[in-house]
Design a protein with these regions (language model features):
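Short sequence/structural segments immediately N-terminal
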Residues: 1-184
C-alpha cells in the first residue's frame, strides 16, 4: 500500500516521532501512511499527546505522551462519534469485570498463575486471554508511571476501562494506525 513519505503540514512533534518510528516501527508507520489520518495531517503526536497529570503520561524525548489512546483522546476530533459510542452498550463491556459472572469465572478457572506487578497475587490467564480480549481489561499503570501492566495492555476489548476514566476502545473496530471505517 501507500507509504508515508512526509506531510507538508506535519507538526514538529509528529515529524520527530516519524524520524525514529519509520525505522523502529515500519509496520505502524506504513499503516498510518495509508490512513485517512495521514492524509488529514493527523500524526503520532496529535493522538498520543498527553497532559502531565494524565495517569499514564510520561516524557518521551521532548514531549509528554501516553502509549494508550482512549476515547477521550479521540473525542478531540471525533466528539460526536465518541458521544454515540459512550452512550452505547458496547462501551460498557468492561463492567463485567466487577460482576458476579466474572467472579464465578475466576473461581471456576481457579488458576491465578499469571503474576505481574499489577497483580502480585496473580490473575487468571484464562480471564486475560479470554474474557478481557473482547470485553476489555481495566488498564493498570505500573509504579514507574510509564509502563502499562502487560496483563491489562495491549488490549482492544470494546469495553476497556482506561486510566483516564473513559470506557471503551475505538480500536476494537477501527484498528490502530490505519483507523479504517471500512474495517469497522
Amino acid at each position: 500500500g501507500p507509504q508515508a513519505i512526509g506531510l507538508r503540514e506535519m507538526s514538529k512533534q509528529t515529524r520527530e516521532c516519524v524520524e525514529c518510528h519509520k525505522k523502529e516501527s515500519p509496520g505502524l508507520y506504513q499503516q498510518w501512511g495509508a490512513s485517512k489520518h495521514y492524509r488529514g495531517n493527523v500524526g503520532c503526536y496529535e493522538c498520543h499527546m498527553a497532559n502531565e497529570d494524565d495517569p499514564d503520561a510520561y516524557r518521551h524525548y521532548e514531549v509528554t505522551i501516553a502509549t494508550l489512546v482512549t476515547p477521550k483522546d479521540c473525542a478531540r476530533c471525533h466528539e460526536k462519534e465518541v458521544e454515540e459510542f459512550t452512550a452505547s452498550h458496547h462501551s460498557k463491556g468492561g463492567r463485567i469485570l466487577g460482576s458476579l459472572d466474572n467472579v464465578l469465572a475466576e473461581v471456576v478457572e481457579g488458576n491465578r498463575g499469571l503474576v505481574t506487578e499489577g497483580f502480585p497475587e496473580g490473575i487468571s490467564p484464562a480471564a486475560v486471554n479470554g474474557c478481557w480480549q473482547c470485553h476489555g481489561s481495566e488498564v493498570k499503570v505500573l509504579a514507574d508511571g510509564k509502563m502499562l501492566d502487560p496483563a491489562t495492555y495491549p488490549n482492544s476489548g470494546i469495553g476497556r476501562i482506561n486510566p483516564d476514566g473513559s470506557e471503551g476502545a475505538c480500536n476494537a473496530c477501527h484498528s490502530r494506525h490505519s483507523f479504517s471505517k471500512y474495517q469497522a
